[in-house]
């Protein structure tokens, strides 16, 4: 007789709170990738990117811009989430972020971080400013693609 290997299957059951959190994150991904959000965020950054300088010192105007950004972007995301999840509570979601920090996709986490972390907000503006001023590194110029296996091309013309 054949020896049958025993297979173990593990069923992962998440709590209702975890499922709710995952649902909110999924909706946030949709909102952030949507053209309406992209236009809102880029329009705001276009308006203020020239104010930011890459120095240790932070201008007082940064605080005003930061507070305006939080009001505009957080409000937009919250309104969009309420349309999708009528019982959504932003305060409860933000407090549950610490428990799920490792589970959140990079883009979502970066956006959320700009609501609470001023340095992340400033870095976002400095990156945007560098891009607008053409100071980003374009790696495509120096890339050369060569085959790993030498191909023999016969030149029998």
From Swiss-Prot:
Signal peptide: none annotated. It holds the Pfam family ARL2_Bind_BART. The keyword Chloroplast does not apply. It is found in: Cytoplasm; Mitochondrion intermembrane space; Cytoplasm, Cytoskeleton, Microtubule organizing center, Centrosome; Nucleus. InterPro entries: ARL2BP, BART_dom, BART_sf. The keyword Nucleus applies. One of its GO terms (cellular component) is mitochondrial intermembrane space. Plays a role as an effector of the ADP-ribosylation factor-like protein 2, ARL2. Belongs to the ARL2BP family. This is ADP-ribosylation factor-like protein 2-binding protein. It comes from Xenopus tropicalis.
């Amino acid at each position: 007789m054949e020896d049958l290997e025993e297979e173990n299957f593990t069923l992962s059951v998440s709590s209702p709170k975890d499922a709710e959190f995952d649902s909110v994150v999924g909706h946030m991904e949709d909102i952030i990738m949507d053209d309406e959000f992209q236009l809102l965020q880029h329009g705001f950054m276009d308006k203020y990117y020239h104010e930011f300088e890459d120095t240790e010192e932070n201008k007082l105007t940064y605080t005003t811009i930061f507070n305006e950004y939080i009001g505009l972007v957080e409000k937009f995301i919250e309104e969009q989430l309420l349309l999708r999840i009528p019982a959504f509570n932003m305060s409860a979601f933000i407090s549950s972020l610490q428990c799920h920090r490792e589970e959140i996709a990079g883009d979502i986490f970066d956006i959320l971080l700009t609501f609470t972390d001023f340095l992340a907000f400033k870095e976002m503006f400095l990156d945007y400013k560098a891009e607008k001023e053409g100071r980003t590194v374009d790696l495509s110029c120096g890339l050369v693609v060569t085959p790993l296996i030498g191909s023999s091309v016969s030149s029998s013309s």
